[in-house]
Amino acid sequence: MSSHSPHGQSSLRTVQVLGGGNAGSSAHVRSLAAGLVARGVRVTVCAPGEADDTYDFTGAGAEHVHVPRSSDPGSVAALRAACTDADLVHAHGLHASFRAVLALGGRRTPLIVTWHNRAHAEGARAHLLRLLERRVARTATVVLGTTSDLVDRARRTGARDARLAAVALPRPRRTEGHEESEPPPSKLRAELGAMGRPLCMAVGSLDGHRGHGLLLDAARVWRGLDPVPLVVVAGEGPQRAELQRQIDGEELPVRLLGRRDDVGELLAAADLALLPGGGGESRSVLAQEALHARVPLVATLTGGVRELVGDAAELVPPHDPAAFAAAVVRLLDDPERAELLRDLGTRQAAGWPTEDETVAQVLSVYDELTQPQPMI
């Protein structure tokens, strides 16, 4: 597969545009950048500085240009300058895509956008998001959706060319000596107060779209179990104080852990992974990590969950805390079902795209858009 510009004089130069607000898309861009650089593509990642601090795009061989997560004139001008002489621009997420549309105004540079999830908003902001979606979909040369639902949405919104994207779960990046410093699961469980009781884990920013309210409502049911399961939630966000008040006021068996950099280790120590709401995330990172780690998953049917996990999880209707609570209780009481889900999860995960396949698909789109077209 080619990695050269249409003129064959120098290697293809791409600009990846990222808002930095979504862990899944940020990890995807890091993985994509590493794969493209390894294939001879020059990659510039335009993202907030904190995103590079976390995901180390420069360590993947890309150039990082700090562009704030904003559509103000200064940010758009910085992005426009970074896109000068780019063979193509690839933006990830709705807001980053809209900034790219503004920055490329008047230029003929091909624009690829990947929709990793569906943006959520209410009231007047919801109307604004629909307008942004329409502008981005109609302007982009190609829209890649990470689920068939997102591809259909892009087409309905006016995309000229919408395709299903192969998006792999990037392998965890380990720092030197990381394995030696990993605490055993028993130690983590003891630190969390989960010895002699089931440990359930959820991950996600503490906002209104992650289903944490449903999770707390379900936890009321679990108070009556013996032993009482402990639910831990890794993540931070604007609803933390409100959720903590409910936990304290109702004495719920839930701990908010805040931001953690050991989510993989916590998940390996858990008996169940819980996904009470997708938050618009089409390919839930937690769901993928749970199946890879052979941790049974209970999830609500939101976003692209069924398409992602198939029959390898307990799936319940959204907005139904009683059904969610019952599914958790059933699974904790049925070790044979839990073991079956582990095996089904391993099988399901084996069919997901690899990082190499993800890079190959993206590079084929790049080549399609930058290679000279035959004269007819």
Residue positions per predicted region:
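N-terminal strand-loop element at the rim of the active site
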Residues: 11-12, 16-74, 150-153, 237-238
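A conserved mid-protein helix/loop that constitutes part of the nucleotide-sugar donor-binding site
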Residues: 23-34, 198, 202-221, 238-244, ...
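Short His-centered aromatic/hydrophobic patch
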Residues: 91-98, 115
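A short, active-site helix/loop in glycosyltransferases that binds the activated sugar's phosphate group
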Residues: 138-163
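Nucleotide-activated donor-binding/catalytic signature segment of Leloir-type glycosyltransferases, i.e.
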Residues: 244-260
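Short hydrophobic beta-strand element within catalytic cores of glycosyltransferases
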Residues: 296-299
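A charged, aromatic-enriched C-terminal amphipathic alpha-helix characteristic of glycosyltransferases
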Residues: 336-367
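Conserved acidic donor-binding segment of nucleotide-sugar-dependent glycosyltransferases
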Residues: 311-322, 330-336
